[in-house]
């Protein structure tokens, strides 16, 4: 049915449409010199095009160019898929209303800003040597993140495994029984970050596994 590849472009476009008018109304009264935004926040691109100011994109993940395409994973959806058609209609309406580029699937995931800051080490990016001077690889920018407290691994000398499903696609309760079965008999410590999953909903948590929702990730990773 297309699944994620069909849904994500539509969701990005729909989200942009929810607030782009408010953004433009605000910026028209105090026109900025440039617009800086996350590469997935396509309202930033729409606004920069509409106001005719430089578009500065921030990448906390992999950027694309002619030799490496993020969009490729989203393009193999039939053109007559309902969500692909809905996305195309939104993109066309934005181009007509705001005078912006046509936000195709290719443009959403592989489009560039006039200047691009990539928060990764250059050598971790596929084909990094093929990116031009409009891309600057700053390396990872990490704050102290003290809001979630601190954490110490059990003092038993065993290796520590940290499990986290990440930021975007993490509502997967079926994952945790699979994890628990995989690590139950291993002589290691495990910390599983749950995000929105209620710890009380999980059954038969192994003795070597600790779970938490909002966790001090940097503390855990440092150990």
Question: How should each PLM-predicted stretch be described?
Answer:
Residues 100-103, 197, 215:
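Short coil/turn linker and secondary-structure boundary residues
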């Amino acid at each position: 049915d297309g699944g994620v590849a069909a849904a994500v472009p539509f969701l990005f476009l729909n989200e942009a449409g929810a607030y782009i008018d408010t953004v433009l109304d605000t910026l028209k009264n105090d026109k900025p010199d440039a617009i800086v935004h996350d590469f997935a926040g396509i309202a930033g691109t729409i606004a920069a095009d509409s106001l005719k100011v430089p578009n500065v994109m921030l990448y906390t993940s992999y950027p694309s160019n002619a030799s490496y395409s993020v969009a490729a994973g989203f393009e193999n959806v039939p053109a007559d898929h309902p969500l692909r058609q809905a996305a195309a209609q939104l993109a066309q309406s934005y181009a007509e209303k705001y005078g912006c580029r046509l936000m195709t699937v290719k443009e959403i995931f592989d489009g560039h800003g006039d200047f691009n800051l990539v928060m990764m080490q250059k050598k971790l990016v596929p084909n990094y040597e093929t990116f031009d001077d409009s891309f600057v690889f700053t390396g990872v920018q990490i704050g102290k993140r003290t809001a979630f407290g601190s954490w110490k691994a059990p003092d038993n000398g065993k290796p520590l495994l940290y499990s986290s499903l990440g930021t975007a696609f993490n509502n997967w309760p079926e994952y945790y029984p699979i994890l628990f079965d995989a690590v139950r008999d291993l002589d290691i410590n495990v910390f599983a970050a749950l995000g929105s999953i209620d710890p009380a909903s999980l059954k038969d948590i192994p003795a070597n596994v600790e779970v938490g929702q909002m966790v001090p990730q940097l503390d855990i990773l440092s150990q």
